[in-house]
């Protein structure tokens, strides 16, 4: 047995499923998950000594690549001053200043510890601000594991075949209305059925939890218009897309103005950080200035703030997003060319530093139904054959891939060459 196999066997006796987040268990592809020893740049190194070109990037945070010296040094320096104080620090102020400068729609920001905390808190705030209970989300979109959001959810919920999780009371779920991504008519129908009851829409501006599904041109502006018409708030969940699709997020890339924005992943530079923020009048409803309660023992902790501040300063440097787009576009085009040579039907969606691979005869993939019609079994074989080639893709047909600026064009070309060999045998 390999060391990964031994560790996985031991882990399953101690940790449910052997992992601390379901997708890591390779449930969506089968086999034994990799146990990682270290990572550097664009590469992961497992406990058995094998190196992989990494397109998971810790599920999005590693936009600069693994073990970036600026982030590592910031963490070390902060740790030398103490790990957590439970009191305000200067770095929290500096971090808030930086985030609100980079994302102009965020007048104010509250730091939390995860994307789930950010979306959960933003929805509570929207409900408190509007005095309404119902929310709209989209089929196949995932916004963390808060009860009200595990309704027709994406990500690991799709992998497990349980988009509606057991343990979520029907009384919670009844306030969550689920519409079809990229279908404005379904959203209007929900508003017309409950014109005075919907507090907010929460949406991934690029759906990254049913693989990678970009919005149609009219979709996000249409959501903004419907929220304005019916007095609801628009929450854009930029946990994946923030600072990745563009410096000011997908909201800037697609020119839509939300009332509230949720952030995570890149904002922590690899440390557990989330944030939500937006209009000043809405944020003023949050405790301690307002009646909507939210709190966290480790929110804004100095280690995480130092890591995030260092990361965002690097991400804000000129040329970062142009490089991400160039690398991702080359990978997408190369995969399509290689698949066509082998006679394999393939769609590759990509926006900025995100991409998605779909084995399908369809010309495009634009919604949950399109994703579910793709050939998952072929993806499973593709995943394992690419893994044997030293390329680590997301171990699920329902998760996006992530590029970093640490990837070289040689890494991209090597990945395309590996795919060409795999397609020939697939």
From Swiss-Prot:
Q: Which reaction does it catalyse?
A: (S)-4-amino-5-oxopentanoate = 5-aminolevulinate
Q: Which GO terms describe its biological process?
A: protoporphyrinogen IX biosynthetic process
Cysteine disulfide links? none
Where does the protein principally reside?
Answer: cytoplasm
Pfam families, per the entry:
Aminotran_3
N6-(pyridoxal phosphate)lysine (modified residue): where? 265
**EC number from the UniProt entry:** 5.4.3.8
Name the cofactor(s) required for activity, per the record: pyridoxal 5'-phosphate
Q: What class of enzyme is it?
A: isomerase
Locations listed in the record: Cytoplasm
Q: GO cellular component annotations, sorted alphabetically?
A: cytoplasm
Keywords attached to this entry: Cytoplasm, Isomerase, Porphyrin biosynthesis, Pyridoxal phosphate
GO molecular function (one): pyridoxal phosphate binding
Q: In which pathway does it act?
A: Porphyrin-containing compound metabolism; protoporphyrin-IX biosynthesis; 5-aminolevulinate from L-glutamyl-tRNA(Glu): step 2/2
**Would you identify the family this protein belongs to, as annotated?**
Belongs to the class-III pyridoxal-phosphate-dependent aminotransferase family. HemL subfamily.
Subunit structure of this entry?
Homodimer.
Q: Which HAMAP family match?
A: HemL_aminotrans_3 (MF_00375)
Provide the protein name: Glutamate-1-semialdehyde 2,1-aminomutase
Q: Which organism is it from?
A: Shigella flexneri
Lineage of producing organism:
Bacteria, Pseudomonadati, Pseudomonadota, Gammaproteobacteria, Enterobacterales
- Gene name, Swiss-Prot/TrEMBL: hemL
């Amino acid at each position: 047995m390999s060391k990964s196999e031994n560790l996985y066997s031991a882990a399953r006796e101690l940790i449910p499923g052997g992992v601390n987040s379901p997708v890591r268990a390779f449930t969506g592809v089968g086999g034994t998950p990799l146990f990682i020893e270290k990572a550097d740049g664009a590469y992961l190194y497992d406990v058995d000594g094998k190196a992989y070109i990494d397109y998971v990037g810790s599920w999005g945070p590693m936009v600069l690549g693994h073990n970036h010296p600026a982030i590592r040094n910031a963490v070390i320096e902060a740790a030398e001053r103490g790990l957590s104080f439970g009191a305000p620090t200067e770095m929290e102020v500096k971090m808030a200043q930086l985030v609100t400068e980079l994302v102009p729609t965020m007048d104010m920001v509250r730091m939390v510890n995860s994307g789930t905390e950010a979306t959960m808190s933003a929805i509570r705030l929207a409900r408190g601000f509007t005095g309404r209970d119902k929310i709209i989300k989209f089929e196949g979109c995932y916004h963390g594991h808060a009860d009200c959001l595990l309704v027709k959810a994406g990500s690991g919920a799709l992998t497990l075949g349980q988009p509606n999780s057991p343990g979520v009371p029907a009384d919670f779920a009844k306030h969550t209305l689920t519409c079809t991504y990229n279908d404005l008519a379904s959203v209007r129908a929900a508003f017309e059925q409950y014109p005075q009851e919907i507090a907010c829409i929460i949406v991934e501006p690029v759906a990254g939890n049913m693989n990678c599904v970009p919005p149609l041109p009219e979709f996000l502006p249409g959501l903004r218009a419907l929220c304005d018409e019916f007095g609801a708030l628009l929450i854009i969940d930029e946990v994946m897309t923030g600072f990745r699709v563009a410096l000011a997020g997908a909201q800037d890339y697609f020119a839509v103005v939300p009332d509230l924005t949720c952030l995570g992943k890149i904002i922590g530079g690899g440390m557990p950080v989330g944030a939500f923020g937006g209009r000043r009048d809405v944020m003023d409803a949050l405790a301690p200035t307002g009646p909507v309660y939210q709190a966290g023992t480790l929110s804004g902790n100095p280690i995480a703030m130092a890591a995030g501040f260092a990361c965002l300063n690097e991400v804000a440097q000129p040329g970062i997003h142009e490089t991400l787009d160039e690398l991702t576009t080359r990978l997408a085009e190369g995969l399509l060319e290689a698949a066509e040579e082998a006679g394999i039907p393939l769609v590759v969606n990509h926006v900025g530093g995100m991409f998605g691979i779909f084995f399908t005869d369809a010309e495009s993939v634009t919604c949950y139904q399109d994703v579910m019609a793709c050939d998952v079994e072929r993806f499973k074989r593709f995943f394992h054959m690419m893994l044997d080639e030293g390329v680590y893709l997301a171990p699920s047909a329902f998760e996006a891939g992530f590029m970093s600026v640490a990837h070289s064009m040689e890494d991209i070309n090597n990945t395309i060459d590996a795919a060409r060999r795999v397609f020939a045998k697939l």
